[in-house]
UniProtKB/Swiss-Prot annotation:
Keyword Nucleotide-binding in annotation: no
Residues reported in the UniProt entry to bind FAD: G9, A10, G11, M12, A13, G14
Subcellular location: Cytoplasm
GO biological process: tRNA methylation; tRNA wobble uridine modification
Reactions catalysed according to its record: uridine(54) in tRNA + (6R)-5,10-methylene-5,6,7,8-tetrahydrofolate + NADH + H(+) = 5-methyluridine(54) in tRNA + (6S)-5,6,7,8-tetrahydrofolate + NAD(+); uridine(54) in tRNA + (6R)-5,10-methylene-5,6,7,8-tetrahydrofolate + NADPH + H(+) = 5-methyluridine(54) in tRNA + (6S)-5,6,7,8-tetrahydrofolate + NADP(+)
Name assigned to this protein: Methylenetetrahydrofolate--tRNA-(uracil-5-)-methyltransferase TrmFO
Main localization category: cytoplasm
Function: Catalyzes the folate-dependent formation of 5-methyl-uridine at position 54 (M-5-U54) in all tRNAs.
Amino acid sequence: MAECLHIVGAGMAGSEAAWQAAEMGVPVVLHEMRPKVGTFAHRTGQFAEMVCSNSFRSDDDERNAVGLLHWEMRAARGLIMEMAAAHRLPAGGALAVDRDPFAESVTARLRAHPLISVVEEEVAELPSSGNWIVATGPLTSSALAESLRALTGAEALAFFDAIAPIVYAETIDMEVAWRQSRYDKGETEDERTAYINCPMNREQYEAFIDALLAAEKTEFHEGETAGYFDGCLPIEVMAERGRETLRHGPMKPVGLTNSHRPAEKAYAVVQLRRDNKLGTLYNIVGFQTKMKYGAQTAVFKMIPGLENASFARLGGIHRNTFLNSPTLLDDRMRLKLRPNIRFAGQVTGVEGYVESAAMGLLAGRMAAAEILGRDLPPPPPETAMGALVTHITGGAEAKSFQPMNVNFGLFPPIDARGGRRGRKDRYKAYTDRAKAAFTEWLGA
């Protein structure tokens, strides 16, 4: 039998890495500290628990980089994408999932695999021998982070990440709010009505911004300094950047028509997305926050339609850690100072559930191939996975390295016409090229 692969962390990346390696015939020991050791953000001991939102973002694999990443992971028979499909919720053109059954099914599949053993323990030190993948995510334990600092001599970088609140659907006033996906996107009626929309006129919007700016915020610990990831900014931080920022961000009113008052154009719109299959819970889209709990309920109840809302969960903020991967990792995602250890997921400086799982998929395949005596190069940079791994292992500037979502700016340029129509053609050219390159890489 092949040597064993140890994986630390059973989040998106660790779960996918374990599945890929085991499917290649390599025995896996999956180390997960939860539920024995908890974190600020996690509620359960389930694997692949979704703590920020329940969305894998756009599922458009022809003109969207994250949708292309979905396609590549499906082509590679990824467990995360398979389970996401099994627990998919209507969300217009996005891929949203029922988060608890999703995590339960990922956990069950991994625990049932004959080549995967699960050990519920905290790994506090970087091991000096054996084959390891560290996929501890943004909430890496302080002991392991300290071990990493001691080995590399480098400070782990950090940024703050916020979580959006969840509302009980039955407490939303549907005489004010209405159901509609932006631009009526979706092939079914469920998809076209996947979001609940709460309209604001100008006076309501201005009062909301005033309250948001004045609300009491969570204070950070003394000496704790870090930036925010731009893709997950707290709404009050966005409001501080300008009073109109939210109107052009998560509260933009475009592509929506109030079914109660079709002739009336909203000045701003707050959207809520279904958070579970039953449709009993909705999260407020883009409303991650660091306001204190009392302030949250007061401010969010100013939203028309949410005056009597009850919250299943309020928002919160936590500190994320990630490596300066361009300095520390090679192109096989191995730690240069200790090549028996690979890193995967958000700890490497990718941002997002899908990106994390994709890096887990690659790390799992690369580690398994190495154990089996083969060398597996990363996918070409023309692919979504290849573009991401190239970025984190050397494509990014080490001095200014920050967490990154997948986007077409990471891909080698392609010649195409300019303008709006040209941009759509260019994105399609990116995805066509990527699919061909990824298919060839998979078959090699």
